[in-house]
C-alpha cells in the first residue's frame, strides 16, 4: 500500500512514518506539511491511505478531507490529531478512523488493518468489473502498415499521437507509423485503460510515469517510455477523473 502523512509538525510526521515502517507492508510512505504539497502528492501518486491532522497551517484538515473525498477514487482517510472535538465531523466524511495523539503502534495498526480489509474487498470487486469490460474488447489492436498487419497487444501500447497526418503508436518495444486517423484506433481500444487527453493524443493510463503542471492550467503527461503528451484544456476534467483527482 501507499500512504501519505499530512501534518504541519515534522515530529508527528516522523513518528507516524516510523510506526508505519514498524508495522510494514507499505510500498511507499510520503509526507506533506500543507495543502500545496498534499495536492502535488495526490497528482503524482494514487494513495491507499492518508493520515490527516485536523489543524494545518493553511487549512482546516476537515475541509481538506472533504475535498479529498470528492476524488473519483479517494484514499482511506484516518484523522490523526491531538483534538477530539472533530470526531463527529470526521466520521460524517466517511473517515476510516480517528486517532488521538500521542500515537501508539497497536492503535495505528488497528486502523491500518481496517483499510487493508476494505481494500481487499474492493480489489476483488474491481478485478471482476475490469475482466467483464475487457471481455468486450479485443486484446490486440490490428495496425496495417504497407503490406503487413501488426497485431499489437493492447497492454503493450503506451500511447498514440498524430501529427501532420501521421499517426504514431508507441509500444513498450517499438513505435509504428501509419496514416490511419486517431479515431479509427480509439474505437478499438479498451476504455478501462485508454483515454483521449487531446485531439491528437490517446494514452494508456497504466503507462503514466509522471504528471506535471503545464501552461494555461493544463498538464503534461510523461509516459513510461519518456514520451511527453499534453492534456488539452477541454479534456482536463475527464483526465483528472481517470487518475482519481475528481
Curated annotation (Swiss-Prot):
Positions of the Response regulatory domain: 2-116
PROSITE patterns: HTH_LYTTR, RESPONSE_REGULATORY
Keywords: Cytoplasm, DNA-binding, Phosphoprotein, Transcription, Transcription regulation, Two-component regulatory system
InterPro entries noted in UniProt: CheY-like_superfamily, LytR-like, LytTR_DNA-bd_dom, Sig_transdc_resp-reg_receiver
Annotated positions of the 4-aspartylphosphate modification: 53
Pfam (any one): LytTR
Post-translation changes: Phosphorylated and dephosphorylated by LytS.
Molecular function in Gene Ontology: DNA binding; phosphorelay response regulator activity
SMART domains from the UniProt entry: LytTR, REC
Gene Ontology, cellular component aspect: cytoplasm
Location in or out of the cell: Cytoplasm
Keyword flag Transcription: yes
Keyword Phosphoprotein recorded: yes
Highest taxon of the lineage: Bacteria
Domain (HTH LytTR-type) ranges: 141-245
Function: Member of the two-component regulatory system LytR/LytS that regulates genes involved in autolysis, programmed cell death, biofilm formation and cell wall metabolism. Also participates in sensing and responding to host defense cationic antimicrobial peptides (HDPs). Upon phosphorylation by LytS, functions as a transcription regulator by direct binding to promoter regions of target genes including lrgA and lrgB, to positively regulate their expression.
Subunit structure: Homodimer; when phosphorylated.
Protein name: Transcriptional regulatory protein LytR
Gene encoding the protein: lytR
